[in-house]
Amino acid sequence: MESQQLSQHSPISHGSACASVTSKEVHTNQDPLDVSASKTEECEKASTKANSQQTTTPASSAVPENPHHASPQPASVPPPQNGPYPQQCMMTQNQANPSGWSFYGHPSMIPYTPYQMSPMYFPPGPQSQFPQYPSSVGTPLSTPSPESGNTFTDSSSADSDMTSTKKYVRPPPMLTSPNDFPNWVKTYIKFLQNSNLGGIIPTVNGKPVRQITDDELTFLYNTFQIFAPSQFLPTWVKDILSVDYTDIMKILSKSIEKMQSDTQEANDIVTLANLQYNGSTPADAFETKVTNIIDRLNNNGIHINNKVACQLIMRGLSGEYKFLRYTRHRHLNMTVAELFLDIHAIYEEQQGSRNSKPNYRRNLSDEKNDSRSYTNTTKPKVIARNPQKTNNSKSKTARAHNVSTSNNSPSTDNDSISKSTTEPIQLNNKHDLHLGQELTESTVNHTNHSDDELPGHLLLDSGASRTLIRSAHHIHSASSNPDINVVDAQKRNIPINAIGDLQFHFQDNTKTSIKVLHTPNIAYDLLSLNELAAVDITACFTKNVLERSDGTVLAPIVKYGDFYWVSKKYLLPSNISVPTINNVHTSESTRKYPYPFIHRMLAHANAQTIRYSLKNNTITYFNESDVDWSSAIDYQCPDCLIGKSTKHRHIKGSRLKYQNSYEPFQYLHTDIFGPVHNLPNSAPSYFISFTDETTKFRWVYPLHDRREDSILDVFTTILAFIKNQFQASVLVIQMDRGSEYTNRTLHKFLEKNGITPCYTTTADSRAHGVAERLNRTLLDDCRTQLQCSGLPNHLWFSAIEFSTIVRNSLASPKSKKSARQHAGLAGLDISTLLPFGQPVIVNDHNPNSKIHPRGIPGYALHPSRNSYGYIIYLPSLKKTVDTTNYVILQGKESRLDQFNYDALTFDEDLNRLTASYHSFIASNEIQESNDLNIESDHDFQSDIELHPEQPRNVLSKAVSPTDSTPPSTHTEDSKRVSKTNIRAPREVDPNISESNILPSKKRSSTPQISNIESTGSGGMHKLNVPLLAPMSQSNTHESSHASKSKDFRHSDSYSENETNHTNVPISSTGGTNNKTVPQISDQETEKRIIHRSPSIDASPPENNSSHNIVPIKTPTTVSEQNTEESIIADLPLPDLPPESPTEFPDPFKELPPINSRQTNSSLGGIGDSNAYTTINSKKRSLEDNETEIKVSRDTWNTKNMRSLEPPRSKKRIHLIAAVKAVKSIKPIRTTLRYDEAITYNKDIKEKEKYIEAYHKEVNQLLKMKTWDTDEYYDRKEIDPKRVINSMFIFNKKRDGTHKARFVARGDIQHPDTYDSGMQSNTVHHYALMTSLSLALDNNYYITQLDISSAYLYADIKEELYIRPPPHLGMNDKLIRLKKSLYGLKQSGANWYETIKSYLIKQCGMEEVRGWSCVFKNSQVTICLFVDDMILFSKDLNANKKIITTLKKQYDTKIINLGESDNEIQYDILGLEIKYQRGKYMKLGMENSLTEKIPKLNVPLNPKGRKLSAPGQPGLYIDQDELEIDEDEYKEKVHEMQKLIGLASYVGYKFRFDLLYYINTLAQHILFPSRQVLDMTYELIQFMWDTRDKQLIWHKNKPTEPDNKLVAISDASYGNQPYYKSQIGNIYLLNGKVIGGKSTKASLTCTSTTEAEIHAISESVPLLNNLSYLIQELNKKPIIKGLLTDSRSTISIIKSTNEEKFRNRFFGTKAMRLRDEVSGNNLYVYYIETKKNIADVMTKPLPIKTFKLLTNKWIH
């Protein structure tokens, strides 16, 4: 064979661009160019014609003699080793690098020109010579065939090789146009193939068959350069060569890919137009073929619609499918899918009719129609390198197992396929040869081959468990009459004649033998991959070869049709006698009926019943002996298993082994119940229970959801509790297969802790009886307790917890002990237990006034888990508290009398039980008690409150027998409190805040006025009620004003129309005197003129009027009322919905009636909509929470689990900081180094742009005379301190331009080389925002400028040296700086002084005092930020005049002149601004965030949902120590710095609503726990979801005579570590938010009032500075205002009493604040808490509140 001859050649030699080729050529793979046969033949004919004169005379050539070329020797004479071939384009084996060529493919000067190599230049003549290869032995570029297994050379091949040198290779034509490149590259590839370089040509998968050598690469490069001039190359080729001018392989690969794509499209269109289908192949295969073609065409831009596709498909239908062409042609909207449904239906009908005829032998048509796959339950595991390509599909396997009816005679197989590589051989038919492959038909005369069979080959089958062959010629060691049962895919027996060995002789000269079965009744000869795998042979369908496990290639695999084949030439023939095999053996068992057949015949009855029936002759025609019962015992009928499947029998007492094998608390059962619907958000919807197998001790935990992290927290809690309290380790936990238990997170947790999860089997609930029965028992108890007590359904878990406590204390009838006794705990002290729902009176230790009653009605729920108190529900406050200060409400008419238990009361029995406990309570009541533990850790449903938008009913009025006791009990002792009608509310508002399930903050001890409209800090609902006006020392009077008020707790004592005056005590903040303020009517209030301010001891009076003003000073020019309205009118405050009037019923008389006999259908149905009128809370610390953030994050969940753990303290502060020190936040590095931008940049276009920017920067440096170019200094002569390292940095701006900057390494600059006192000033962000706001209100033009290389205009005073830029190549030299290079410590200050001097002296500007980089004159305002200038002016010509002056000195570019009257877009210092003069301004960063956030590697939108708020209330950061290695710690700290750095940049630019979260998380940069990172991810996720939000400004009303500057202040008392408070301020100019600040108070405050005073005092200095700036930039009068929601703070500011302050720090701040308010003409007003937009700066808010406070100014 030719391939075998080529494989003998010596190692690769190297030759010229024109090489000889053998007479016959075996190609290694399919032509990647898919050149048509006609074109190939034309090319070959042309080549033959051109070389026709050279066939007889070896020295003849088609090219004239060239003086550079020596005449070659005749081809018959082998050249010497160093042969006389000095030609520049020829090389022998020992001449790898001739002159004119360089190593590794880099060409040197080539001594010949392209025309000398072109046969078109000289006409061929007998005297002309053309470079050629030497004889075959030394063929320079011959490639050995990797599949040539023989190492010997026969004479014929040698002769052929000798004659092959007589032919010469015709070079490709010259490329003359870029458009001709596709055709030219085809001829060039053909040229390489003729030059024996076919192995280096990339195949269809882009990889060559073998590795190219360096000399071959040189040959490739030179020939390409010669025949393809660079001026005629396409652009994409030039781009490749610009990266690597020797990468010809990449050009060839892309060319092949392009041509393959074009060829594939044409083939697909032709195939689709010529579809044919008659049912001979499976319908699913036909559908797959068609849909794949349509999909490929659609993906390539050739759209095939349904109508056209259906027409093409129906046109090719024939046979039984033809009628579809007539039934479907009228359907206009028919789809391809619908058409294939009909085709599948017909195909399945055909197969059903054929399969219903059992026959061992089928005709030839059956071979094509059977589509059932071969299934063999006993087949071993299939071993294949690429199982996707194995022949195990339905269609393939079915045809492989069809039974043939032909009589195949034994024959000899001499098939052979010549193949020089391991690439796949694709054969479309028996005669189709691609790339020169030859297929010699087998001489075996097989008759009636299948149409899709490849003769002379074995079909590779991964589904066959045995190898089957029709011819006995290759069977060795055959034995006839084997007792082997073989069935096909339809479970039909295949008669086997003999069994023997099949012996292979592979091309690596190894022999292998496998077992084979002989039968003539098959369609194909099958070679089982399973049996090959048993002898360490696998089929690799990636390379299409049979190989061993060590990678040794044994034989090629041929793909023909849909199957893969291997040639029979590797089989060794045998001399077996055929007649001895063809004698089919018939055993005794074949004459009997098989039992499976009888089993199915008799309706799948069992074997015992069938045998009994045959014995008793109830079934006739055959006897019991006629059935083969050998397989009846172990036979399993699949249909019986499916149809008669039942659950396994649960074995009683099966858990006894666990009780005996495990110690207490080692084996737990757990289950989850829920959800319970129609409950408020604060109430849990699920609970999870645990039961110990040995002790039967039970735990229950509430759950709000079933998320992975929630369940994980419970498991962590229970395991820690058992370990610490019982010194036991849980070994096994039994649970069901719910997703909350089978998730990966919990599985890893259990695995980490060495716990074995024991799951129940599917649908086997009885195996989980312990947990299921416990849940049922607890739910029964829950329903009973709620029904008995009449408590609302949202307290359902309290009933569960009460039942758990009791059940753990009751003895089991089986064990005679309680669970507590088994656990080693003391019995339950019943004297500490109260009936569930027992009415009690709870002491209120902090009433709103001294005359308020101190008792609050409540209902006992269960003993506290975390203290010695009791959990009590207070319906008036809509919360539960943990307290010991309560008294049991007693009376003859007990709460339980409604159940008619013989009219019995249990008061005396209850007294007797709780006598000792009462004495304890009584003794403690002597002291001032603070046990109303609002700070309790009992957080799962504490602080349950109603929707805050409606007023709340507080039931705390003292009741007399006259107005509370019914007639039947009116004569009772008046000292006893009657409770006949004490009823707990049935339901609460379903909108109860989820955030309020956590304990609220302690009430401030600051005196407050009790009013139904006041908040916890003195809030009001009416916004337009100013409390302070500017104070004047010359005009200070006390106000005697009072207003009509309703007592907060006794709101029902007064009617709405009541007009009498009532004195209300007012407690003081720092004094001891109490004063009374008479209530007056609204009419009198409006007529009052306020002249005097009350003392500090008096709290401010209240009025329902919206025009009540309590001033400190009365302005002389503007009335107080107009000032207040003017300041508040334009503020972006939320609009609150109107509140409906609410009645406040008597706590003991007007509670809504409850029908105790009303029953709930189920716990899941709790929460009917018959709740009474919702009542509202006024406490600022309790906010409404509409929904929770719906993104699942680990640890992002409130830890609300409860167990029997001992009492423990827990700090209740939001987002606590775990570290004190915080490093500076590092910004994200957006620049590239030189090596990143240029050296190793694979993006050619980007690289070119960076190179251009590099040269531009160098030219600018030289132009500016940055360094002294006259002298270079030696490094050894200069003090190292004065040598500054330098570098180039590159970045891409948002406008798409690429920029390079040469900078100094100022970060390592020595301190002696600069003046530390100099400062680099830039414009303050507040100054820029103020200027922008004034520009909008005054219709200013805004012009943006940029000064190129600004720092280089500033001279440098110090003596500094730098290393020259890299392109200069002077690494050992230094140059002296003359200009302020970017990066130096002093450069910024030098530039600031330079530009400042120029603006003042040349431009006539002056700098605003106190505001650096803000310059102004009478017409123009300039804000300077390094080299960026923003100009504001009423007259655009004034801006142009400044620009003209600047251009005289500096290279000034106009970024945006701002002359358009339409919307103009700016990019100013990172802010993306949309400005339409006289209308609006929008500030955002959408484009910047869209670019930067994805680079942070934060997972965005894990569930595809957007966040509605940046955080949720009630979350705590764990303070546990981090267990983390140093490298991981540094990595996470760096990640936190990047994330918080970006968030800070955005927050302080315009997203002031995020400042609280940013400030809090910034404190945790050095504590990067998983929880902290998750919270940071949530913040980044929210920024991503809201990246399109903008700060919206609208132009102020033109009629406004003044500028109004307002600071809104707020504080959250004690919500930071070490009892520090969070304070926040928002600044507004003319109703536009221009800045915000959120920070932790520097001092520890002891009350809410102190925190509010601290917040206000922090806002005043900046307010005054902004006021000065505004007056300098705009000459309008200015009104300054302070808004706060703390009345007590306002009272202190306006008071003149200086006698008492709580401490000197507090007193100092208060006194200073008084002076600042008085001396700076500040107006102080009260703002309602619900409208205080600064609330977002101090605490995390629920979604509804967050949106309400921000949607007016940022959206």
Swiss-Prot record:
Annotated protein name in UniProt: Transposon Ty1-PL Gag-Pol polyprotein
Binding site for Mg(2+) 1: D671, D736
Domain (RNase H Ty1/copia-type): residue spans on this chain: 1610-1752
Basic and acidic residues bias spans: 1038-1053
Reverse transcriptase Ty1/copia-type domain residues: 1338-1476
Domain notes: The C-terminal RNA-binding region of CA is sufficient for all its nucleocapsid-like chaperone activities. Integrase core domain contains the D-x(n)-D-x(35)-E motif, named for the phylogenetically conserved glutamic acid and aspartic acid residues and the invariant 35 amino acid spacing between the second and third acidic residues. Each acidic residue of the D,D(35)E motif is independently essential for the 3'-processing and strand transfer activities of purified integrase protein.
Residue span of region Integrase-type zinc finger-like: 583-640
